[in-house]
């Protein structure tokens, strides 16, 4: 039996789609030196090659892919978007605006200079910025622009072509820039990170190991009684002196949870909770009494929970003001926008921040109720909320405004992005609403993006040879300019206008470009995860601005003549 693979793929859109995805994901795992191609470029290359052979898929799959992707981007940005936008993120907002705005203006100028159409220009902007949201926003706006069908088809093909030709240029140039730009300025990045560490009490060790607290019990001997000198636990400040917390006391056979007024007595048996190194550093007066292995005394459920910051008495406060150790809890991690932050007593908490807290289950529950709620570790997605907000986003995208003969609509991309932001924001404020496990959200987002990339590649593949021959050199030059010049402008603005610390500035610049690989290089150069503070500050707002940039470039293009 002979199987004609070409006919089989042409006759089955679903089979073709998943063949492209499988081959592209395999290709994306390849490395060129220290640079991995990545899933997006792998799928794009395979789809372009098959597109040259005139394979194609239904455009409905393409549309659904970009809708899922942009909605999930909004959900991820939602918890921190408004806090960054309205409160302490003025510098980060301005940096993101400068980065995206300068790239948009430069792309428009180069597009007109080289005589390209809007498709090539918008695609070049998206590829040079390595930003799929730009591609998605521009494509959606083009489809609703009222172009006649042949002109629209050409613009969409050129959009994909421009993106494909400049994506690797944008990615590689930014990674190289992230490696060498810090060396061209006067201030050493590592020194800048250490300066912030000294000013704010930051832990500069990016690879800090996290240990869970352990329980050990000791019998109070004469040395410890003498050490306490009759002071109660509150006056002694046991945690400040030892790094351990007295969780239980057995006195005369009676087990109790001590309060601050308790005074240690000879023969008491105490259960100490603390990190292993804190136990090792205990004063000999604690250890000289016989260590106790009492099942009831040591029977404590130590848990580690992710606590989401929500309540007004915690939002806007510094970490030190939470006084977690006074409540017998230990802070392991601070996570903002999926980025682990340095544990800094002076970090101001935003709504939606996640604190990983360890301690006795009752105490962790108490502290969680005080500052927010414990993140639900369920594997069940709230599909009702997901679908409802998806519908709301599509309805928002249908809204149009008429000004004389000119009509303006938000489009599906902006509508779904806004609806996703609202869902993410509400999830951060209401623990039982709209829960989507991070793994599920990442999977849907990645799948939507890959479907979209497969669609644009198959659509543009037939014209890529002609495009390379006619405009390849122009695209190379334009891609380098749009990728690097906004970064330099952003650096000058942040360094000499905003006068930002260099470690925070470079992190914020990579966040404004939403480029995680470049962020890793900055952190390595600084020997610190302090740049993550800046990265998290601009990342959420940049995702939104980049989507809007794709819409804006299509809208303003006709008016430029």
Swiss-Prot record:
GO cellular component: plasma membrane
Gene label: ybjL
Pfam family of the protein (one): TrkA_C
GO MF annotations in UniProt: monoatomic cation transmembrane transporter activity
Keywords: Cell membrane, Membrane, Repeat, Transmembrane, Transmembrane helix, Transport
Major site of localization recorded for this protein: membrane
Compartment annotation: Cell membrane
Parts of the chain that traverse the membrane: 8-28, 32-52, 66-86, 94-114, 158-178, 383-403, 406-426, 451-471, 475-495, 540-560
Alphabetized InterPro entries for the sequence: AAE_transporter, RCK_C, RCK_C_sf, Transp_YbjL_put, YidE_YbjL
Organism: Shigella boydii serotype 4 (strain Sb227)
Protein family: Belongs to the AAE transporter (TC 2.A.81) family. YbjL subfamily.
Record keyword Transit peptide present: no
Membrane-related topology note: Multi-pass membrane protein
Biological processes per GO annotation: potassium ion transport
PROSITE patterns: RCK_C (PS51202)
Superkingdom to which the source organism belongs: Bacteria
Domain RCK C-terminal intervals: 200-288, 292-373
Listed name of the protein: Putative transport protein YbjL
